[in-house]
Structures are given as structure tokens and as C-alpha cells.
């Protein structure tokens, strides 16, 4: 008797850099609003990269949400399947996590445990260079259609999904309350307190080391 396939739905990206968080937010919304078949595992992969390889190796079916530079207009959502997925993840890398996930897929293939079915649901980001920022409205609007696309794809593998009556579900798979989308957006300090382009301590340090005319070694102490 054929057993149900092991299915992994994975969101990758970085919540701290605006639209980079699309994949993580998509899985968060899926966990919060839908109950899935018991053979489906939802995972916030964040920027873990190579550390995800064991999870990927166990999956027969892998669905990935991510912000991807397709070279398309901002906000465009695009699906890519099977052997095309690594090529699109690597075409225009926007962050180190994409390099890491390419390596995850390559290592899984090398070890002979590559998913039989692979779907990438990506969205072209609007803004990435906003440290501590949230999804832009144009990207946030893509979460629901991205989830619908994933559920339609998973239905062919016998996955049954039903809406939760209460979206305040308490789950270890959801982010820390401080990183919940609403809390994250409403609790963000103003630009006079929180630098928008990175850690101000690091930026100040780098600025102090900038080479000035007549001072080839910078302002090092």
C-alpha cells in the first residue's frame, strides 16, 4: 500500500530586510490560517542555508517560498518547477541565503535524496535595502495568492487543507511574538532611533576607517 509522500513547505529569507522576508511571512500565514494534512511539514527556514539539508533530504515534495530576482517588474509572482529551480535561485543572487540553499539542493542531489517534486514560488521584490523594514504593500498582497498557488499544487498529492476557525493559533512553528507581522510593523522605532541601512555601530566604525587624503591608513586608533 502506497504511503503518503513526505511534504516540506519551506519559507526562506530574512525578515530584517524588507521584502527579503516574503518567504518566511508566507509560511507564517499558511501556518496561522490553514490546517494541513499530517504528512505536510511547514518550516521557517530563515537564512539557515546548508543546515536545512537534512529536512530537504527527507522530503518527497518540496515547496519553497522566496523573494527572487527574476528581472521582472516589482511585485511579479512566478512559479518554477523541478530542475529549473536551482537555475532561478542562482541567476541573480540577492543574498547569501540563496547561495546556501543552492548548496542544499546540490548536496541533497549528491547524496541521492533529492525531492521527486520541487516547486519554487517567488516574488520579485520592491525594496530590500531597508534594515528593520517590513514587506512593501505590493509584496504583502502576494502572500495570499502564493499560498493559493501552493495549495493547488499540493492537492495533486492528496493534500487536504482547511481554514482554521481561529487564526490566533499557538504553534512552535510561528515566529516569536515580537516578530509577528503586526507587532513587527507597529513596534518599529523611527529613523532617528533605528538606522535604516544597517547597524549604525558598524557603519560608524567603517566610516572611521575610510581612507582620507593625506591619511592612507584611515583614522585607526
UniProtKB/Swiss-Prot annotation:
Q: What processes in GO biological process is this protein linked to?
A: protein processing
**Which source organism?**
Thiocapsa roseopersicina
Lineage of the organism: Bacteria, Pseudomonadati, Pseudomonadota, Gammaproteobacteria, Chromatiales
Among SUPFAM superfamilies, the record links this protein to: HybD-like
| Keyword annotations from UniProtKB, A to Z | Aspartyl protease, Hydrolase, Metal-binding, Nickel, Protease
The record's section on NCBIfam families has: hupD, hydrog_prot
What is the name attached to this protein's record?
Hydrogenase expression/formation protein HupD
Q: Which InterPro entries match?
A: Pept_A31_hyd_express, Pept_HybD-like_dom_sf, Peptidase_A31
Is the keyword Protein biosynthesis in the record?
A: no
